[in-house]
Amino acid sequence: YTDGLALKALKTIFEYLPRAYENGASDPVAREKMADASTIAGMAFANAFLGVCHSMAHKLGAFFNLPHGVANALMINETIKFNAAEAPVKMGTFPQYDHPHTLERYAEIADYLGIKGRNNKEKLDNLIRAIDELKANVGIKRTIRDYGIDENEFIERLDEMAEQAFDDQCTGANPRYPLISEIKDMYLRAYYGE
């Protein structure tokens, strides 16, 4: 019973986060709505768990002192693309699913948010664009590198960071189970913006 909670939280975030960011304390309604969205999202993930985005964000924040929300925002697009793949190398750990339904689920999210597309792939692409727009509207930079993280240091720590993200408690609940090499690839794409 988590879908409705997650969808409500998403819609509220898309509607009120830019206002809360822009207006701060002068817009108590937007701040209240964001507190509600945070609580509702917490209720959803307390039952449905998190996934590899949070795993990677935990390590990105720990290794490079980035706030957890920023780290999640930096990793979300790559995670969505990874999860939406039609033919994963390895499935998630929940055996009741014979294949991932994530592309379809992301399209449902797009529909709920009023994001259009002629098919599920187009809805996915438009959802990612909407997320990029939301991030830009609240001051989230485009890449990990944009936060001043030195390329050599990032590459030097990448293997350890990817291994720790793989072992993070959230990874097992991801709908598509990542290989360590796939986690590294997601980090690299998020670093360079590719």
Locations of the language-model features?
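Carboxylate- and glycine-rich phosphate/diphosphate-binding segment that chelates Mg2+/Mn2+
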Residues: 1-48
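Gly/Pro-rich interdomain helix-loop hinge
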Residues: 66, 70-153
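Hydrophobic packing residues in well-ordered alpha-helices of helical domains and bundles
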Residues: 6, 31-34, 124, 158, ...
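Short coil/turn segments at secondary-structure boundaries
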Residues: 1-3, 29, 122, 145-148, ...
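Predominant activation on well-ordered alpha-helical scaffold segments within soluble catalytic domains
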Residues: 7-18, 35-39, 53, 57-61, ...
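Intrinsically disordered or highly flexible coil/loop and linker segments, enriched in small
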Residues: 22, 44-51, 89, 118, ...
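Glycine-rich phosphate/pyrophosphate-binding beta-alpha loops
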Residues: 39-72, 167-173
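Short, amphipathic C-terminal "tail helix"
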Residues: 153-194
